[in-house]
From Swiss-Prot:
Residues holding S-adenosyl-L-methionine: R101, D102, E117, R118, S153, S154, D176
Gene3D superfamilies: Vaccinia Virus protein VP39 (3.40.50.150), YhiQ-like domain (3.40.1630.10)
Keyword Transferase: yes
Gene: rsmJ
Upper lineage: Bacteria, Pseudomonadati, Pseudomonadota, Gammaproteobacteria, Vibrionales
Protein name in the entry: Ribosomal RNA small subunit methyltransferase J
């Protein structure tokens, strides 16, 4: 993928080169997007809209830390959808990891979570945030133990893993495909900013419907699909049950009991 690759200090250039090599990113001086390496973190900036600010992954502080401490624990909707309220601590594969927030919530509640993110820029941001989180005094130990990242297209990865005899299938496959956002629907400023940048960088997940069948083949217990409250069922398939919040819905497709 091509975008501007920028170092804030020349001493960081070898690290940026390594990131570019790992995620197959090449420099394009004409791109409106820039991946910027600072001494603190890796950031994505939209250069033609500087007021949007930088997008980066911070699992140790900010809104993510607040949700971990005060978000409702196993009583929150995502935990119920994943089956944690049944007394289980399932293994999870997050097939659309994005910036890792939902995966982090599940990991903070005890789940081992493998993350798949097919966009290399988003994966690079997530990898950087994960690396920093693993060094954090408060959360580093369990993040290292419970969270891992696999860079691949979900469609390819889910089908390939389901047919891999060596791979231990997860209890739960979690999907949160990007969905076109109507202008009349309110979002927090942060989410709105991220969605705007990501949709112009990545585009909406127009092929998201193709995720459900391989996800059902891979999950041993259930597939959880996060949808906006106004969205139709993924691939038009009615879920076994749905858990609704003010703005979202978790559609649950049950393969087997959690017990």
């Amino acid at each position: 993928m091509q975008l501007q690759l920028i170092c804030e200090d020349a001493a960081l250039q070898p690290y940026l080169d390594a990131i570019a090599s790992k995620w197959q990113l090449t420099h394009d001086a004409d791109s409106h997007f820039a991946l910027v390496l600072t001494f603190e973190r890796l950031e994505l900036r939209k250069l033609d809209e500087p007021k949007l600010g930088a997008i980066y992954v911070d699992l140790a502080g900010g809104a993510v830390a607040h949700r971990r401490k005060f978000g409702g624990g196993k009583g929150q909707a995502i935990a119920k959808a994943a089956g944690l309220n049944k007394g289980a601590t399932p293994t999870v594969l997050d097939g659309t990891a994005g910036l890792g927030r939902d995966a982090f919530v599940l990991a903070s509640l005890g789940c081992k979570v493998q993350m798949v993110e097919r966009n290399p820029v988003v994966a690079a941001l997530l990898d950087d945030g994960l690396t920093r989180a693993k060094k954090d005094d408060e959360i580093g130990a369990w993040v290292s133990e419970r969270m891992s990242l696999l860079h691949a297209s979900s469609h390819d990865a889910l089908a390939a893993l389901a047919s891999d005899a060596e791979f231990v299938r997860p209890d739960v496959v979690y999907l949160d495909p990007m969905y076109p956002h109507p202008e009349n629907k309110k979002k927090t400023a942060l989410v709105k900013k991220e969605m705007r940048v990501f949709q112009s960088l990545v585009g909406a997940d127009t092929d998201a419907d193709a995720l459900l069948t391989p996800a059902l083949a891979l999950a041993t217990k259930r597939v959880v699909v996060k949808r906006p409250d106004y969205a139709e069922w993924l691939d038009g398939v009615k879920p076994s049950m749905a858990i609704e919040t003010k703005k979202n819905r978790f559609d649950v497709y049950v393969n087997a009991s959690m017990s």
